[in-house]
Structure formats: C-alpha cells, structure tokens
Swiss-Prot record:
Residue segments, region Disordered: 637-677
Gene Ontology CC: endoplasmic reticulum membrane; vacuole
PANTHER family xrefs: VESICLE PROTEIN SORTING-ASSOCIATED
Top-level taxonomic group: Eukaryota
Organism: Arabidopsis thaliana (Mouse-ear cress)
Protein name: Sec1 family domain-containing protein MIP3
C-alpha cells in the first residue's frame, strides 16, 4: 500500500486547479506563502501557465508587468489563494480587484471551509458562505468603483487608501442582495475550497501556516484552568459544551475533517485531553454515512492536547532542526486583521519562513562583489519595481557607501527551506529532521561533499572526520555557489548547508548548549530534593541578572559573554524547574512544590534582578511598572554621581569651621521632604513589584500542578519519567510515550474513542441483541495520524519515528502534525507573554 506523502498531496492539489491558474496572475497571502515555500510550489505555478505569483498583502499594479510566461496581452484573470477566513482577507482582495480594473474574472481559493465560516461566532457569513461572499465582493467592488470615479486622479494612492478603509464587511440581507455574482460590469467572482494549505517539513510531518486563520485562532477562553490563548486548557476532566468551544478548536476540527476527505481517509478518532475531546466530538458530529462510504482507506486519528506535555517544547533538545528554527531570523509577519471577538484574540505566531543567510556567505570579498556589477543590477531592479510605491530618496539604497551597499544587497539574498528538495530521492529535510544535531550536521556535510564531487570542484579545507563545523561548511557552500549553473542545480543543499552553518555558529550553539546543560542540571536536581532544585533555580536567576547587567554596562557583549543566559532565559528555566518540581515533589503548604522559605528566596532573586535591570526581558508581568522602575534606577544612579566629589572641587565648609554659612534651613527642610517623598514612592513601587512577582508565582504554581490536575497524567503511566534516566523512555516526550504504548497495545488512561456514525448506529441498533461493535484499536490501523493541538517541535517528530522503528512495525505509516511549530522562545511568549492568562 502506498505511503502517505502530504507534500506531494499539496502539489497534486495545485495541479488540480490548472485551468484556473493558467494565464492568470496568482496572488497568495502570507499563510499560503509559508506553505508553498515548504512545498516548493512556485515553479509548479509557472509550469501550469501562471503569469506571475505575487504577494496579496504587498500587491501593486506593477504585478501585471512581471509576466513570466511572456504574454503580450493584458491579464484578464486573477487567482487569489488565502489561508484566512474570507472576511479577514476581504480588504486585501478588494484592493487587488480595484487595482487591476481590467480583470474580468476573479477566482478565490480559501483553506477555510464553508462550514468553518458559519461555525465561527459573529461571522458575517452563513452556511452558504462562498456564494454569499461572491455577491458581497462584487457589491463592495461596485461601491468602491463608484467612489473612485469621484476622486481626483492627481491625488493618487492616498485617496484610494482612504476610500478603501471606509468599506466594511456587514452581514448580507437576502432581500436586498442580487444573487448573481456576475453583475459588476463583466466581473465574475467564484469562491472554492482548497484545504491542503499546510507546511510539510517532511512527507509525513506538517504544521499549519502560522499566519493562517486556524493557527491564529484562540485555543482556550480565559478561566481558572487555562494557561494561554495559544494553548489548550488543563485537562481536568470537566469537558465544556461544544457550543462554547474556542474558535481554534472549531477551525481545527473542520480542517482535519476536510484533510481526511481530501486524502480519502476513513478516520477512527481517539482523543487525549479535554480540548482534544471537544475537537473529536465536532469531527464525529460532522461525519455521515455517505462520507464513510466515499472514503477508501481506514486510518486512526489521535488528538493530543499540548498542555499534557509543556516541558518538551520548553526545553532545548538534541535536534538540528530545532536549532535551525531557533537560530535563524524569521520573515516579518503581516499584522492580522482578525477582530477581537467575544474577548478572544488572535494569536500572532512567528512566521515559519526562516531567512537562510545566503548573502552573508558571499560577503567576504566586497571588492569582487562590486566589480561584478551585481549591486548595480539589484539597484536598477529595485528602481523599476518600487518606483510606484517608493519615494526616490528611499530607492537608492546602494549609493551611500561601499560597506553599507554590500550589507544591504546581501540581505536580499535570503534562502528558505524546501521540503521537496531531494538527494537521490531522499528529501533533505526529512533525512535531517530524523537525526540528532551531530549526525544531522555530518549528513549535511556529506551531501555537500557529494555535490562538489559531481561538479568536479575541489575545496582546500581542513575537515575532521565525524564532525561538521561552520568554517568547512561555509567553504564548501561558497565553492558550490561560484557558478550560476552549480548554484541553481544544488540550491537545495546549499540553502540547507547555509542554515546548518548558521545554527552551528558559536554565538548560537554556545547558548543552546548552555540551555541544554542547565536543563539537565535541573532534571538531576529534581530527582534529589526540593531544596537543591530551588537553589539551582535561584542560582540561575542571580547569575543571569549579573551577566545581563554587565553586558548592558559594556553596551556590546564581548566574545567571552557568549553562551551566557539572560534574565528572560532564566525565567524560562524557572518554568521548566517548576514543572519538574510538580512532577517530583508533593505540593507544600504554600500551594507550590517548594517550601515558603525556598520560594521566598526565589521571589527575592527575581525582585532584585528586576530592580537592577527593569527593562530586561520586556516582561508582561511588569507592564505599567517598567517606566517607573527605570526612572527610579536612573535617579539612584544620578544621586550616586552627585555624592562622589571631584578631585578639584573646593570644600569651603572644610576650610571654615564657622557654620554661619549654612543658613538655608528652609531649603534643607524642603530637600528632606523631597527625599521622604522619594523614599515613600520607592517603597510603594517595591510593594507593587512584589505584588506582580506574587502573581507570577501563582501562575508557576498552576504550571507545577499540571501532573495532578491533568486527568490523564494522574495515574503516572504517561507522566514524565525523568527520575529514571536508565529507562529508554526516561527523557522522551509525551508523543514518544503515547506512540510506544499505542503500538504495544497498552492501556492509555484518559484515551477516549469517538464512535463513527455507523458505529453509533450499530451500537444503538444491534447492541441490544449482544451484537455491539468492539472498540477498535489504534494499533490495528496501518495509517496513524497524530495531531497535537497547540503545536509540535522537531525533537517530537524525531522521537515519533524512533517509537515506530523500535516497535518492529515497519508497516505503520505514521503522520504527525500540529497547530504550529514551537520553539522555546515561542513557549515563553505563550506562557509569560501577552497571550498568557496569569
């Protein structure tokens, strides 16, 4: 039976819309851009006959000029692909149509189904969402066209923007709407569903676009069991009514349902965690007898709440893939236009579009770069491309000085990771993500060496067998990039090699290794005593505060400070420490895992660190206090400066014993009063700070109670086994432990099976005669899809494949997915950032 390949399925879905893409300008939003970059879809669009592939958010009228298929006539068709709800992408689509006034047909593809649009609260669209939106878009286009006719042409773009901002999307009243979508002076609008807008890292591992509506939607509402808008709530067993589930759960259920339809899978649904049960129930309710009959292949779907295992994505595991995504800069995300509905915000997750620094590798010889004429060519291109939207003074980026010129143009030469790039049929990313850091980097080095042999290129570089370093990777990449033919032929391994070299850079790898060592020490201390663990956390906070303060004094940290942790980093380790403490120590009388005295020392360490450097970390729990704390610190520094007399200052009072000169009793009294007021303000400020720190620790108590409050973890068989490092699964994440138990057919506490429609019918109809259907097992399925609601990281993908390999079941086709890709920094933002519930 053929293996499932989600990346190839995405490409096949694009081929299915060839008739719409042919001879059209294709606009894709930021979420689709993330997806299509991983899939490697841009060459396919041009192969199918697209005139150009352009950004929907950054569209200009010049997009019609960039015709890659050399069409002499004007474009009459536009295709818009979006990963957002139609109402969220509306203003971009309207601007696109209004700019290309000669367009006669607009085809919209959205990854959000009609059912999702009608299921979201406060949605302006109903069950017939696509048809309604076709009419609405034509109406708003007509309205804008009428307004534009009244605007003087010499006022240009600014007037267009103001007219566009006045257009809003209101619910459609059926009696006032002309159902025809083709009544706008020949403009025909059609809306279709395109479900496979996902970001596949490998053929069997994917996440959702971070700038799409599903990933941005909230996964919990604020209540006592919730931790963050971007994470499911704690699974206490009190499953909420599905009518009140957050929008993220609803959109996730609809996405998985449509994914199964597209992949022709009949799902047997299992869930672990309260939010997963909600999603499973929605999925089951959406199923019907006809859906089951249409699907060809049986598969098991295991839904898992991220909140059941927060420590894995918080830690810095041995994964080259995770190092790359944590080290490389990301593309700037576009601001979400999703409105705050019912007190639930959209989550601004970091873009998945990593910026591979290819330009930096070519920046070593500026003189050769200048002689090649490349900067002038890029400047000429930018002048022509940006002349419509950019001021003349902003276009000549390369004429200020040679150094700045070289820096600017190299920023344009950023690469990206593509999941479909292969080496002899093996996808680069798949082979790398299935290996740990050392093995993965050595594999990348071997691929580069093989590419050099194929191109007959020799490189004089000192290499250590069994190791890969940044200098040798850079030398090989630069040699492969000397000619255009070699660069294009080997672009996949060149980009991956550059990403690996950036992750192995000392400034990045030293800090990651420091994190990893600190987490290991916390793990060891958690297996000993609470006093030792508390002392370890306190030491990390104190050292990080001192290091950051020293770096601030030096303005620029020198090389000796590389690898040192910041105060923000220490807070992330504090989260890890509290979760470990909750798993290993019983709750003390203070409500947390530590005694009152142990926790008091931790609080004092954080208070002292904040008082010494209030701006460190840009922390949510200091909102509203940071400026006051900075003012206090600056005042104390200025007073210290005044108290130190200069060497040439003459002390008159020391030369004259006659105290009559000190006549300013009133002035001294005013100074004393002022100092008393300042002292009172300082005391009040410290009290406010301690209150904030107390609220932080109440949130840490909630994190430490995850094992006791999460119902599936109470029995202990799924909980972290960090205190037994000799066990094979001792330091593995929850996904590994789940898959291991599933494939060995062990009982999993809290795992719920959601009967299909046919199963419920058989159970209710024939069950009374003793002919009820037996509960299926996930292990009996040849295809298993594990989806983590809240997100996954690279180490979990690696461990999932390890679990399958160790099970001795090569017939199992395992696919792992998640809401988004999580890094430790992402977890910090979710737990202590603006979307946290503490």
């Amino acid at each position: 039976m053929a293996l499932i390949d989600v990346a190839i399925s995405c490409l096949n879905s694009i081929r299915e819309i060839e008739e719409d893409v042919k001879d059209a300008i294709v606009y894709i939003d930021a979420g689709c851009t993330e997806s299509f970059q991983f899939v490697g879809a841009f060459p396919l669009f041009l192969e199918l006959g697209a005139r150009a592939v352009c950004s929907l958010e950054n569209m200009t009228s010049l997009d019609a000029v960039a015709d890659w298929n050399s069409k002499s006539d004007c474009a009459k068709r536009i295709v818009i692909m979006t990963s957002r709800l139609l109402n969220d992408a509306h203003r971009y689509m309207l601007r696109c149509l209004s700019t290309h006034e000669g367009v006669q047909r607009c085809t919209v593809f959205t990854s959000i189904s009609e059912g999702s649009h009608s299921a979201i609260p406060d949605s302006p669209l109903g069950p017939d969402a696509y048809r309604e939106y076709e009419t609405l878009l034509v109406q708003d286009y007509n309205e804008h066209t009428k307004k534009s006719d009244k605007i003087s042409k010499d006022k240009g773009v600014s007037k267009f923007s103001s007219a566009l901002e006045s257009l809003t999307m209101e619910p459609i009243e059926s009696e006032n709407v002309d159902i025809s979508s083709g009544g706008a002076q020949g403009l025909v609008v059609s809306v279709h569903h395109f479900p496979l807008i996902i970001c596949p890292f490998t053929p069997r591992a994917f996440v959702l676009p971070s700038q799409g509506s599903v990933a941005e939607a909230s996964l919990s509402r604020q209540h006592e069991d919730s931790l963050s808008f971007g994470l499911p709530p704690i699974s206490t067993g009190s499953m909420s009514d599905t009518d009140d589930v957050p929008p993220g759960a609803t959109l996730t259920a609809h996405f998985l349902y449509q994914l199964a339809l597209k992949m022709e899978l009949k799902l047997e649904i299992f869930s672990l965690g309260d939010q997963s049960k909600n999603v499973g129930k929605i999925l089951t309710d959406m199923s019907s007898v006809y859906d089951v009959a249409r699907r060809k292949r049986s598969a098991g779907l295991l839904l898992v709440d991220r909140t059941l295992d927060l420590i894995t994505p918080c830690c810095h595991g041995d994964s080259l893939f995770d190092r790359i995504f944590s080290s490389l800069p990301r593309a700037e995300r576009f601001s979400s236009q999703a409105q705050l509905k019912q007190g639930v915000p959209s989550i601004n997750r970091p873009s998945l579009d990593v910026q591979v620094p290819l330009g930096e590798l070519l920046n070593e010889e500026p003189s050769k770069i200048r002689d090649s004429g490349l900067p002038e060519g890029i400047e000429a291109f930018l002048r022509g491309w940006d002349s419509y939207t950019s001021a003349p003074q902003n276009v000549g980026l390369f004429n200020e000085c040679d150094k700045k010129s070289t820096t600017n143009w190299t920023e344009l030469l950023n690469g990206s990771l593509v999941a479909t790039e292969c080496f002899r049929g093996t996808p680069y990313l798949e082979a790398m993500i299935d290996r740990k850091t050392k093995d993965g980097s050595v594999l990348v080095k071997k691929w580069l060496q093989e590419a050099l042999r194929r191109e007959n290129i020799s490189v004089n570089v000192r290499a250590r067998p069994g190791y890969a370093t940044k200098p040798e990777l850079q030398a090989m990449i630069k040699a492969l990039s000397q000619s255009q033919s070699s660069l294009l032929k080997n672009k996949g391994i060149i980009q991956l090699g550059a990403a690996t070299a950036a992750a192995l850079d000392e400034s990045q790898s030293a800090k990651w290794d420091t994190f990893s060592s600190a987490e290991m020490m916390l793990n060891v201390s958690a297996g000993d005593t609470s006093q030792g663990l508390a002392a370890q956390i306190s030491d990390l906070i104190n050292k990080s505060a001192v290091a950051e303060l020293q770096a601030k004094k030096n303005e620029k940290p020198d090389s000796s400070s590389r690898g040192l942790l910041s105060f923000r980093d220490a807070l992330l380790l504090t989260i890890v420490g509290y979760i470990l403490a909750g798993e290993n120590f019983p709750t003390s009388g203070s409500g947390g895992p530590f005694s009152w005295q142990e926790e008091h020392f931790l609080k004092e360490a954080i208070v002292d660190a904040v008082l010494e450097n209030p701006s460190a970390g840009n922390l949510k729990f200091l909102n509203g206090l940071t400026e006051e704390l900075e003012g206090r610190l600056n005042r104390l520094k200025s007073e210290e400066t005044k108290e130190i007399p200069s060497d040439d200052q003459l002390d008159i009072d020391a030369l004259d014993d006659d105290p009559w000169g000190k006549w300013g009793d009133e002035e001294e009294e005013e100074v004393d009063n002022s100092k008393a007021d300042e002292s009172y303000d300082d005391m009040q400020l410290k009290l406010d700070l301690r209150d904030r720190v107390d609220s932080l620790f109440r949130f840490l108590h909630k994190l430490s109670s995850l094992r006791t409050r999460n119902l599936p973890l109470r029995e202990g068989s799924l909980a972290s086994e960090s205190s037994f490092p000799g066990e094979p699964s001792g330091n593995k994440g929850l996904v590994y432990r789940l898959i291991t138990k599933v494939l060995s057919k062990q009982e999993i506490p809290g795992l719920e099976y959601h009967s299909s429609t046919v199963g419920r019918f058989i159970k209710s109809g024939f069950g009374r005669f003793g002919l009820g259907q037996a509960k299926p097992s996930l292990a009996d399925q040849s295809v298993i899809l594990v989806f983590v609601i809240g997100g996954i990281n690279g180490i979990e993908v690696l461990e999932a494949q390890e679990a399958v390999s160790e099970s001795g079941r090569p017939d199992i086709n395992l696919v792992i997915g998640g809401t988004t890709l999580l890094t430790p920094d992402d977890m910090f933002e979710l737990l202590l950032g603006q979307f946290s519930h503490f």
